[in-house]
Swiss-Prot record:
InterPro entries: Cyclotide, Cyclotide_moebius_CS, Cyclotide_sf. Disulfide bonds join C5-C19, C9-C21, C14-C26. This is a cyclic peptide. This is Vodo peptide N. Keywords: Disulfide bond, Knottin, Plant defense. Probably participates in a plant defense mechanism. It comes from Viola odorata (Sweet violet).
Length: 29
């Protein structure tokens, strides 16, 4: 139920601050 960060992480890494990767989408911590 975490809000989506507006970023994908198909390479396994999120570049947006405060976001973590739950492949293939980044979620806010």
């Amino acid at each position: 139920g975490l809000p989506v960060c507006g970023e994908t992480c198909t390479l396994g890494k999120c570049y947006t601050a405060g976001c973590s990767c739950s492949w293939p989408v980044c979620y806010r911590n």
